[in-house]
Amino acid sequence: MDMRTPPNNTDAEKSILGGLLVQPEAFEVVSEILLPADFYRQVHQKLYQVMLELHNRKEPIDIVTVSNALTSKKELEQIGGSAVLADIMNEGPTAVNIEQYSRIVKEKSLLRKLIRVNT
C-alpha cells in the first residue's frame, strides 16, 4: 500500500483564499475553475465554501464577513479560529496570479481523483 501524500499544493490553496479576501472581485475567475472539494485541506474547503455562499448571495467577501459566516455556522473554531483567517489573508496579499494558482489546485484535485479511481 502506497503511503505517500496525495497530490496537493496547499501554498496555492492559501494564496487563492488570501487573494479572495483582499480582492474578492477575483472570485469570478476562481469560481469558474474550482469547487470546494478541489481543495486538499478540509479547512480550505470550508473557507472556500463560505466564500462561495457569500458570493452567490452577492454579499461582500472579506475577513469580517467570512468570520461572521463561519461563526453563524459554528465552524470558526473548527477551522482554527480567527487567527487562521488572518494567516491566510497574509499568505495571499494579492490576487495577481490567482487564475494560475486555481489551475494548479484543480490539477492536483484531478490527480487525486485519478489515484482514487485506480486504487
Role assignments for model-derived ranges:
Residues R116-T119:
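A short N-terminal interaction module
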